Curated annotation (Swiss-Prot):
The keyword Translocase does not apply. Residues 326-418, 444-480, 509-603, 835-923, 977-1115, 1209-1266 form a coiled coil. Keywords: ATP-binding, Cell cycle, Cell division, Chromosome partition, Coiled coil, Cytoplasm, DNA condensation, DNA-binding, Nucleotide-binding. InterPro entries: MukB (IPR012090), MukB/SMC (IPR050308), MukB_hinge (IPR032520), MukB_hinge_sf (IPR042501), MukB_N_dom (IPR007406), P-loop_NTPase (IPR027417). The hinge domain, which separates the large intramolecular coiled coil regions, allows the homodimerization, forming a V-shaped homodimer. The N- and C-terminus together form the head domain. One of its GO terms (molecular function) is GTP binding. Homodimerization via its hinge domain. Binds to DNA via its C-terminal region. Interacts, and probably forms a ternary complex, with MukE and MukF via its C-terminal region. The complex formation is stimulated by calcium or magnesium. Interacts with tubulin-related protein FtsZ. Identified in a complex with SpoT; IscS and ACP. Interacts with the ParC subunit of topoisomerase IV. This is Chromosome partition protein MukB.
Amino acid sequence: MIERGKFRSLTLINWNGFFARTFDLDELVTTLSGGNGAGKSTTMAAFVTALIPDLTLLHFRNTTEAGATSGSRDKGLHGKLKAGVCYSMLDTINSRHQRVVVGVRLQQVAGRDRKVDIKPFAIQGLPMSVQPTQLVTETLNERQARVLPLNELKDKLEAMEGVQFKQFNSITDYHSLMFDLGIIARRLRSASDRSKFYRLIEASLYGGISSAITRSLRDYLLPENSGVRKAFQDMEAALRENRMTLEAIRVTQSDRDLFKHLISEATNYVAADYMRHANERRVHLDKALEFRRELHTSRQQLAAEQYKHVDMARELAEHNGAEGDLEADYQAASDHLNLVQTALRQQEKIERYEADLDELQIRLEEQNEVVAEAIERQQENEARAEAAELEVDELKSQLADYQQALDVQQTRAIQYNQAIAALNRAKELCHLPDLTADCAAEWLETFQAKELEATEKMLSLEQKMSMAQTAHSQFEQAYQLVVAINGPLARNEAWDVARELLREGVDQRHLAEQVQPLRMRLSELEQRLREQQEAERLLADFCKRQGKNFDIDELEALHQELEARIASLSDSVSNAREERMALRQEQEQLQSRIQSLMQRAPVWLAAQNSLNQLSEQCGEEFTSSQDVTEYLQQLLEREREAIVERDEVGARKNAVDEEIERLSQPGGSEDQRLNALAERFGGVLLSEIYDDVSLEDAPYFSALYGPSRHAIVVPDLSQVTEHLEGLTDCPEDLYLIEGDPQSFDDSVFSVDELEKAVVVKIADRQWRYSRFPEVPLFGRAARESRIESLHAEREVLSERFATLSFDVQKTQRLHQAFSRFIGSHLAVAFESDPEAEIRQLNSRRVELERALSNHENDNQQQRIQFEQAKEGVTALNRILPRLNLLADDSLADRVDEIRERLDEAQEAARFVQQFGNQLAKLEPIVSVLQSDPEQFEQLKEDYAYSQQMQRDARQQAFALTEVVQRRAHFSYSDSAEMLSGNSDLNEKLRERLEQAEAERTRAREALRGHAAQLSQYNQVLASLKSSYDTKKELLNDLQRELQDIGVRADSGAEERARIRRDELHAQLSNNRSRRNQLEKALTFCEAEMDNLTRKLRKLERDYFEMREQVVTAKAGWCAVMRMVKDNGVERRLHRRELAYLSADDLRSMSDKALGALRLAVADNEHLRDVLRMSEDPKRPERKIQFFVAVYQHLRERIRQDIIRTDDPVEAIEQMEIELSRLTEELTSREQKLAISSRSVANIIRKTIQREQNRIRMLNQGLQNVSFGQVNSVRLNVNVRETHAMLLDVLSEQHEQHQDLFNSNRLTFSEALAKLYQRLNPQIDMGQRTPQTIGEELLDYRNYLEMEVEVNRGSDGWLRAESGALSTGEAIGTGMSILVMVVQSWEDESRRLRGKDISPCRLLFLDEAARLDARSIATLFELCERLQMQLIIAAPENISPEKGTTYKLVRKVFQNTEHVHVVGLRGFAPQLPETLPGTDEAPSQAS
């Protein structure tokens, strides 16, 4: 027999009053005796804390707080602990003799909430010799010890060999270990289970009949029939899911057209926009590539134009430079012509002026002679006039003197003044400041002598002048001629220079005679030189255009080569034209073929899509129409085979369903009639009696009873006989066994057990041999096992049936799809791929375009080469006639030589022309230059000086004469002399004076006439001189100008200059013409460059805009593609046939679909908002989001248990296949799942009956319990009247309420609740829902009422209530009920725990003073009978005779409070024996 586990000891560490105390627990009763505050409740609290370490439940209160709803803030635990680490440990030994120490580490948490920290732990494998206090304390000295923290305790235990230490983070794990090791009776899986356990302990602790326990006895004693509840829940869940699925199918059927419409329009809306963007992206890419090609071509053209522009600009610059030179040359030639013409005119002027000068020279010489004669006559007239003047003056003086004498007094002063004036004038003229009237006579003689001397000298010089005049005139003429020819020179050098000039003149005349021949020769050579230079220019230009330098000898061969090249290029150009026409014709044919293929491509793509769908659906590849027709025949055969297999699987599934239904009957009856017969006979089915048989024992009992497994056990067979008469509604073989259903055993047979078989000796002459069945069905566990296997098989069959049904309908739809394909697309599906051909043709078209472009480039190059060759030939035609000139290298030297000789000759001609006349004049008179006559100029100066001296001497003598004459007047300073003489003298003087004045007048008249004539002569001479000088100066200027002109004004110079000018003009005109051509070409080139630049700019802008648009679109397109691929909708959106529609058609298609979608999603707010957002043309990804949202919406609407795909399109295709099949299957499944109301009533009744039997068995254990007036205690289990009525209606009158159970809107639980409300309208259901009420009605415990009854004295059986029992009786009754609860838990948990473990049993009782000695003895007896341990807290006057008693006394020693404990074992006549180790000295925690 298995020994029951026991609690060995309780250890308290650092509790209030207990520093390290171990209480050894008795195998039956341990009594804690002591006064108030001794520590009894603290000890029990430590035990309970170690047993249930849940702070949410622990609440230690005094018995006076038994009815209180709240105690102290710390619920009694914080105050029972001391500061620091505390422990409460239970030392146990289980049925396996394993020592297990479980406990908790407690520690106060600082704070006003007075919390406690609890850590549960367990120790296994601890040797028996080790005491718990030794584990958690460390002795410091004889009087002090230290409590080890939990981590040190762990380290200490890990150091011990074979000892296991476990620390738990959850109370559930802690209790799970305690349950597995047999410390507690029930597995506490949840807080609710812990609460029940705690309430049980609390009820036993405080004693009496706990109202909490009494009210919830059903929860404590009646196990939860989780299997039945789970079955009902599974059934309802399956029904609910089935109905939801059916409803979903109905909704799906109603929404199928909406789905199709929504998917179709959404696909059209998004796919059209998707393909439009794809087409636009392709178009944009093509445009970008085209722009890039055009940009590259334009750049090449611009570069070519720029090179051309540079060449033309360079040529234009050369022509501009040459034009400048030519203009300069032309202007120089024109200027030279003008200079020649000017020089000729100047030469004519010079000749004319020279003739005039010769004439003027003659006239000037003649006028000089006339002037000289006039001067002589003028001098004579001046002398006569002066003599006449002197005579007049003398006569006037005489007359004045005479008058003065006449009137001295009047004239004396005047005379005196005149004398003074004459004296002053004489002083001034004679330079004699000391001159006086007295010495005037002396000075007069002197000055008269000087006058005479000067006059003589002047006359002598005049004579000399007359003689040298003639010789001086010839010398001056010759000298002037030499000076005019040679320039200024000394007079003594004139002779040598004149001879040299004459000799040079002869040489110059000889050279001047060669000017005309040299000029003609030079003109001819210059013409040849110009032609040579033109040829060299043409050759240089030709070499530059050819890009190569050629020798003169190579030009003829080059000319022939260029002519041959021209002929060849001409043939190539004509052939290229034909080739270009052929290429263009092929290009047009390709374009036409591409257009026809693009028209055929959508039809072919639609056929290919249909073919691909067929290939995907059937997993085959079709290469021809024959393959399609052959596969269609195979499809028909496969359809027939699948239908046959489906029917077979369906039959097997129905058989399994029937077997499951049969095995699911309550009580294990395979025939419903047996249940009715058992109720009719008042018996019990044998299968119900053995319903709890284990799965291991099921084969044995099944073989033991054999065919009588389904027998009915009745108490008395004789009472059944009358019922057997006329019995027809029964199985063919009905077995009846007599026996007590409450104590039935298998002793009715004599059995011999064999290997996997039994031999049953039914009678002496009848044995039955039965083997153990492979699949036993005897007992609930066996049936459940079989049902589980059948359910698994049914699931497989159902899945296979569904798969086959789906395959059949899929095959049928595939057959329809093949038929549609054959009718619509078979004709074009297996034709060649037009898109592949289009790609090939496009590739060929690109090649043709590239060939055309290359051909155009080659043709252009050939044309350029042809033009270059023609230009080269033209240039060579101009160069070849001048090859001899190009070969003449000495021509320039000869021209320079002739030009030098011509310059010398022209210089000589100019010399002769300029100085020929002077040389001719000089030649006859050159000899006068050999000797120079007197210095004629000096002589002239001496003569003029003598004349001046003579005049000065004459004036001085006249002034002195006047002074001398007025010498007398100086004496008349005071008065005037008296007038002397007579009147006659006066008259004579007057007459003579008149004559003298007349003569003087005549002389003056003659002098004035001669002076005027001389003045005229002088004027004529001056005019002639001025004219001569002017003309001479003009002539000199003209000669200088002619020299400055620097040209030779001969007869042929003008003609040569004009020819040169005309040639340069022609060259300038040609140059200007070429320059104009180049300027026009350059302007055109610049315009072309500007156009190309603008085009290039526009192309660059368009290209970059397009590239940016492509890049931007690429980012958006990548997002779209990523979204499409992530959501797996590319196959739906990338409809290749739409690629051949225009953007307008696609936009129109998308807009039409958008209008339809707006109506379709008008009632769906989410899709409406997403659709509205998707209308943004700049955000194409939003259309994909809308499409995904539509798919997601459809996925949510389509149940995945109905349709096996995530694709709504495929779901719609599968939907039509699945809907009808699922509807039938689910309808039948609902009928099978829906358990009948009678079955529910039978299940609940059988469960109630079984539990009633179990309670009866528990009551048998309490029959012998008695204390006080209580003779016995029992539990009474009754069915509530309202629920009994419900069971009767469910089993007998359920047809009246089928409106509830057949309603698809109500679950079975709700229908059950509605029926309960219908039967009991007086009951208020409150706020509970019908589902909650129905679930409660499916729990059999709610059908039962349990109450405790006691057999007390003469009153018989009474309901146990606190008011009807004494305190001791109430405590005993409550303890009995608690023991029953523990027994019930053990029975319930036996199958969950190992069979070799019997759990510990321990209860508490605080304040046992309320019991008398007999009641306590009864408790001892109860504990002994039930192998239960009990801890009692009692006052000091209680001394049980049995068990272990601890005397607790609380003492204070040196301010330290501790509990003194003395333990006693038993209570006999002998002296009490002190238990070892119970004395504890006061200890102080270190």
